[in-house]
């Protein structure tokens, strides 16, 4: 590892510890030349996950987009940001565990909706109304009936 101060290539590791729930390693290093101490992080590089949109275009998966949608759906609801971040992480983990490099956007939407259904019904309906693009009030009412039916079961 090259020292950021003197650019010497010789450094030694003083301390290593796992961070980010074991997904990264934090290393404290010291330059053998100038004795400067600095920190580095090592993590596994995930292969890109490509989202195939409804119109056929492709873009790289962006968990921030999911988080923004969740925040909007949960606006003025008793749902913490931490819960939404966990949902976002769980969605990404579930998609990566599929072992495929491309995933359709509607699959992502369904996974997000299922997670929201367990957290807050109102947020679920808000998200579903945008995601499923309810055309009229009847479709909206049917979705509400569906939620009520599942709660009774």
From Swiss-Prot:
Q: Which domain of life is it from?
A: Bacteria
Q: How is the cofactor bound?
A: Binds 1 zinc ion.
Residue ranges of domain ATP-cone in the record: 49-139
**Named cofactor requirement(s):** Zn(2+)
Q: Name one GO molecular function term.
A: zinc ion binding
Coiled-coil residues are: none
PROSITE patterns recorded for this chain? ATP_CONE
InterPro entries assigned to the protein according to its UniProt record, in alphabetical order: ATP-cone_dom (IPR005144), NrdR-like_N (IPR055173), RNR_NrdR-like (IPR003796)
Example of a GO biological process term: negative regulation of DNA-templated transcription
Q: Where exactly are the zinc fingers annotated as unnamed? A: 3-34
Query: Which keywords are on file for this protein?
Result: ATP-binding, DNA-binding, Metal-binding, Nucleotide-binding, Repressor, Transcription, Transcription regulation, Zinc, Zinc-finger
List the transmembrane segments. none
Q: Which family does it belong to?
A: Belongs to the NrdR family.
What functional role does this protein have? Negatively regulates transcription of bacterial ribonucleotide reductase nrd genes and operons by binding to NrdR-boxes.
Protein name per Swiss-Prot or TrEMBL: Transcriptional repressor NrdR
Protein species of origin: Bacillus cytotoxicus (strain DSM 22905 / CIP 110041 / 391-98 / NVH 391-98)
């Amino acid at each position: 590892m090259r020292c950021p101060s003197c650019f010497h290539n010789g450094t030694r590791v003083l301390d290593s510890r796992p961070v980010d729930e074991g997904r990264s390693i934090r290393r404290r290093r010291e330059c053998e030349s100038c004795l400067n101490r600095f920190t580095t992080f090592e993590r596994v590089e995930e292969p890109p996950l490509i989202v195939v949109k409804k119109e056929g275009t492709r873009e790289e998966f962006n968990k921030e987009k999911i988080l923004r949608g969740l925040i909007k759906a949960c606006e003025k609801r008793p749902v913490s940001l931490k819960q939404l971040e966990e949902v976002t992480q769980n969605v990404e983990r579930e998609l990566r565990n599929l072992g495929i490099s491309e995933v359709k956007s509607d699959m992502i939407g369904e996974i997000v909706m299922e997670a929201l259904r367990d957290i807050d019904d109102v947020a679920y309906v808000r998200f579903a109304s945008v995601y499923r693009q309810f055309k009229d009030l009847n479709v909206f009412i049917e979705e509400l009936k569906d939620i009520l039916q599942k709660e009774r079961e």
